[in-house]
Structure formats: C-alpha cells, structure tokens
C-alpha cells in the first residue's frame, strides 16, 4: 500500500527511522490488548492472539486509529495508508536454532494466508480486512462492528471459499459514514455478482460510486461487471475475487 511505497522512497536512515516511529505506536497497542508480537515484517508486524478474537479485532481498529491520530514525522505530507489483515486458525509456536542462536518461530498456514491478504486490503480499500472464519468466532459480530462483505477468496488447496469482511470501524470518519450509507447496496451488488447477474450488479455499484466515488472495491466490481455482462459465456466466470 501507500505506506510501503513511502518506505521504499526514503533513504536507508530515514526508512528505518520511519519504521521505528510506526512500530513504537503499534507495539504498545498489541501488548495492551493481550497480543504477542511474533515478528517484525517489512514495514509492519505479525501479532498472534491465542484467546479472544475480538481482542485482535479491537487492536486492529485501535492500530488504525492510533496511526491516524499521530502521523510519523518522516512520512511528511504524503498520504499514509495503513492496513491490518486478520485470519484465525491453528498455529504451532516453538524454539528453533542451534547453540547460542535461538529464536521463537510460528508455523501456521494462516500466517501465510494473512500475509497473502495484505495487498488485497490495499487493493479493495479496507483498513481492516478480516476473514469470515475469524469473524465467525466473535459473538454478535454483525451488531458490535461496522462491516461489509467484500467478496470471497478461493482457498485452492482446501477447495472452498473464504468470505472477506471490510471492517470499517478502522477508517476515518467520512469513509466510515459513506461505507455505512452504501453498505446495503454494495452487499446486494456482491450477491448479484456472485449469481452472475452482472448487469444488475453493475447498476448497484454505480449507485454506490455516486455516493462514495473513492470506494476501491466498488470500482473493481464495476470494472468486472462492465467486462463480463456483454460476454456470451458470462456465467462461466468465477464468483471469487482472488485465489490463494
């Protein structure tokens, strides 16, 4: 996303200063919410929550709000996009190494999947992108959080679809309001898209974009609908957005 672009544009000394400024804001939020920082990854981090998934989601929302409240000095005037992805599943944590060089290691298919989701969060404009499996572990998810179904990812090895949620409590106020106002139309559009009713879905995404012209997910769906609805074999297109 934009944050990675900013990091790559800086000289090495400025780059590490910016990364450390960001991590100094992120790590306390993870610690205070009961998370464990497993590793620092590029310009971000991987955190593990072993008990309550709502703590992980609450921390994700807080991370976005924390960074928005205090811009790192090295970012300058450039727009700073920050994205959090959440998945849930089993993980093995152990110590690896030899002699005096030992470190903790986490082995889990879900950490790899979470990393796969990171560019998708930026692509579809989700500050917090969460899998349906993780959301399903939170009681009253739909009532406690503001979220919309973005669509589906095909899990190739498991031959199943995983729902993705854009939890927009982590967005800035105007974006949050616009996503809530257009949520019903957007989700109806996604449902029609998944039913291969591309023309009708297209009309709904146009309505969404009239109200929220910066909606990246709606723009992507509109592009797909414009491409598909004229085709003779349109029903053969997949209902999912990405394949893992």
Specify the residue positions occupied by each region the protein language model found.
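Catalytic/regulatory signature loops of cyclic-dinucleotide turnover enzymes
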Residues: 70-71, 109-132
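Conserved long alpha-helical elements within nucleotide-processing catalytic cores of c-di-GMP signaling
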Residues: 4-27, 31, 38-39
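Flexible, glycine-rich loop/tail regions that form catalytic "lids" or insertion modules at the edges
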Residues: 238-244
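Cytosolic regulatory/linker segments at or just downstream of nucleotide-handling modules
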Residues: 91, 122-200, 206-207, 212-224, ...
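Catalytic core of nucleotidyl cyclases, primarily class III adenylyl/guanylyl cyclases
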Residues: 29-55, 69-109, 133, 158-159, ...
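Short hinge/gating elements
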Residues: 3-6, 96-104, 174-175
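Active-site-flanking beta-strand signature of metal-NTP-handling nucleotidyl enzymes
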Residues: 1-5, 44-47
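Generic non-transmembrane alpha-helical segments
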Residues: 18-33, 62-70, 211-213
């Amino acid at each position: 996303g934009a944050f990675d672009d900013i990091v790559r544009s800086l000289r090495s000394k400025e780059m590490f200063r910016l990364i450390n400024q960001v991590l100094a804001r992120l790590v306390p939020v993870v610690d205070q919410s009961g998370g464990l920082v497993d590793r620092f990854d590029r310009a971000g981090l991987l955190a593990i929550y072993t008990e309550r998934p709502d703590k992980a989601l609450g921390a994700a929302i807080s991370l976005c709000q924390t960074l928005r409240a205090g811009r790192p000095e090295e970012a300058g005037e450039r727009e700073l996009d920050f994205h959090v992805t959440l998945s849930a599943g089993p993980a093995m944590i152990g110590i690896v190494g030899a002699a005096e060089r030992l470190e903790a290691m986490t082995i889990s298919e879900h950490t790899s999947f979470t990393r796969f989701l990171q560019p998708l969060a930026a692509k579809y404009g989700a500050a917090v992108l969460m899998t349906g499996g993780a959301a399903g572990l939170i009681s009253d998810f739909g009532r406690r959080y503001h979220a919309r179904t973005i669509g589906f990812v095909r899990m190739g090895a498991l031959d199943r679809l995983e729902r993705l949620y854009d939890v927009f409590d982590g967005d800035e106020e105007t974006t949050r309001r616009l996503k809530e106002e257009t949520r019903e139309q957007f989700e109806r559009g996604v449902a029609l898209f998944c039913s291969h009713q591309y023309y009708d879905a297209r009309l709904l995404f146009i309505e969404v974009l009239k109200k929220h012209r910066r909606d990246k997910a709606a723009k992507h769906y509109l592009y797909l609908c414009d491409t598909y609805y004229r085709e003779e074999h349109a029903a053969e297109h997949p209902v999912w957005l990405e394949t893992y």
